[in-house]
Amino acid sequence: APKITSSGAGSKLMQNPELCGRMVAAARGALGPDKPLTVKMRIGWDAEQLTGVAVARQCEANGADLIAVHGRTREQMYIPPIDVDAITEIRKAVGIPVLANGDITTAEGAKQILEQTGCAGVMIGRGALGDPWLFERINAVLTGQPEPGEPSLNARMSALRAQIYEMCEEKGEWTAMPQARGQAMHYMKGLKGAASLRRYCSMLEHFTDVDKLIEAVYKLQG
């Protein structure tokens, strides 16, 4: 986000591999030798500054135990497909485990990127929004088990309600509900009347509104 990079933080650090190394060293010094230290990074700042390998090596040399690589530059944000070759290059450049990240929304997609990059695993972010069952499907495919089917409508609504309830318990309703609006929208994907349901999501103010939303979902699905 611009407000992050404008302060020199976040993916802006991809422009300064040495600083990344010093930060990892400081974190390692604070944590001590026994606690795991992980790093999340992109492949570079832009097409002219593909510093992923240099950053990864600095992180490894200064005590990182694992690196997760999002396969785009900061300039690309989330628009083009991830650069599998760039992730692979970073994975080959270090001796610690590397996780592939970006555009992983299906179990087969996770399996494919692992085969393409040779990474030790995957990191899931946006792909799991509204679909917490993605991890179960990935685990099944990677272990040679039958892939579970799509969750029922009851399961989806129960998960939505439970997630927002836990958010309210942790953060308080005043803080949690504005954040819950976006989370709820992801659960509307593929449902009849999804557009109107997303508008309903955008107006959630209290936890009791979630039950009203779920009632509207069932009514529209018939």
Tell me the role of every PLM-derived stretch.
Residues 1-60:
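Active-site entrance/lid segments in N-terminal catalytic domains of soluble metabolic enzymes
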Residues 15-16, 68-72, 77, 100-102:
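Catalytic beta/alpha-barrel core
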Residues 34-42, 66-71, 100:
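Short beta-strand segments at enzyme active-site cores
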Residues 40-46, 72-74, 103-105, 127:
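Active-site beta-loop-alpha junctions enriched in small/polar residues
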Residues 2, 75, 129-132:
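Short gly/pro/ser/thr-enriched loop/turn and capping motifs at secondary-structure boundaries
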Residues 13-17, 80, 153:
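Flexible, glycine- and charge-enriched loops at secondary-structure boundaries
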Residues 22-25, 29-32, 51-66, 85, ...:
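Alpha/beta catalytic cores of nucleotide-metabolism and tRNA/nucleoside-modifying enzymes
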Residues 48-49, 79-81:
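Active-site core of PLP-dependent enzymes with the aminotransferase class I/II
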